[in-house]
Structure formats: C-alpha cells, structure tokens
Amino acid sequence: VQAAAEAVDRFFPLSLGSEGSCQIGGNLSTNAGGLNAVRYGVTRELVLGLEVVLADGRVIDGLTSLRKDNTGYDLRDLFIGAEGTLGVITAASLKLFPRPRTVETAFLAVSDIGAAVQLLARLRAATGDGVTSFEFLPRIAVELTAQHVPGVSDPLGRPYPSYVLCEISTAREDPALRGLLEASLEQAMADGIVLDAVLAESLAQRAALWKLRESVPEAQRAAGASIKHDVSVPIAALPRFMAEASAAVLA
C-alpha cells in the first residue's frame, strides 16, 4: 500500500515494525496503531470504506470514498478491529495524504514517562499537528537492542533512565522546521524536561535512529522469552500506569 501511494506522490501513514511482512487486511482486522498514530490516528481513522464477506457468504459492499455517506448504516467500524469474528474484510478504501517534504528526527533522553508526556505537550503546542511520531523507550530497551542487534548503538553514548524518539514533519518544504524543533528542545532542556538530545543530520542517521526503535522486538527475542502485549492508555494516565505496571512486573 505504501509503495502504491508513493508511486502517485501520496503517503499512507500506517507504519509498523512488521510492515515488511504484515498485510493491510490484518492491520484492519486488528485496528493496528503504528508509529505515526500520534498524528494520523490508528488504522480505523485511515479507512473510508470496506467490502466484507459474512459467514453466510453475503457480501457487504461499503467501498465508498466519501467522508460523509448517509445512504445507510455505517457498519465499517464494527469490522475494523473485530479480528475476523464478524466477517472477512476483502477490500478497503483507504485515506492517502500529501507526502511529507520536510522531516526532522530527534533522539532524546528524559527522566521518566512523566517528562515524556510534558515534552509531547510542548512539541504539539510549538508545531501544531507537526508531531508525526513520538516513541517512548526505557533504558532496558536501548541496552537490549544495542547488545543483540548488529549495527545498533546508543545514539547518546551514555546511559539515561528513559528516551524518546520523535519526529516532526510538514507537507511542504520548510527550512525553518529544524530551528523550531531546536528552540523547543533547548527550552525543554533548560526546564529539566530533556536531559540530552541528538538530531539526525542525514537520512542515514534518521534511518539508524529508527532501526534502534524497530529492532526492539528482535532484541527481546534474542534475550529470551518475553510476554507480548498491546495496551491502550490515555496519555494523561501513562505516568500512573507505568508506575503501577512496573511495580507489578517486578513484584
């Protein structure tokens, strides 16, 4: 899907660590989130219409490309995320967006999830809808990945409690975007929200930062058995959730 969108100079924003092997039908059935959900939303928000085959063989043709369609009941959201229990999705109308023309990527050290939440609010206030990705990583994730995945290292070169990999972008050429990000991060560092930072200076450095994030599952497998989970929590509740969940895991 992403390649087809790129061929017509458009952008399909659903991006997953498993995007090299997953299929759009599975993404729809699980309502996958992805790395760009902070700006574009989860899979449900990227769909205009569906074609679905029910268990008795009937076909529901809802392949509309309209944002507003009052010709009947909108059953789309019943099937997205239902994991095939209500019917098999056989086709979909998907939303495409203008391709990002200017992208800035930063890898940041923060004290904890509370600081990360504060940083997200600041970046959103400074850039509007410019925050495309915002990934929180505990220290152990960076350590495991650097230890078990060839070609991956700690971008900051020294240990910190937690990290954020963030990206801001615009659909136009905007040479001022980097300065805006730098100014926001400088103020965050002055206020003690950000402890250290590195900004990608090239496409290769950007790819290296994202390789670290996307290689975390591979590092977990190499380190031994792990329990996979996918939990949705309101942003404001993340600090409390992390504190209670971490205590429960360590108990």
Give, region by region, the residue ranges found by the protein language model:
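Noncatalytic alpha-helical scaffold of FAD-dependent oxidoreductases
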Residues: 1-251
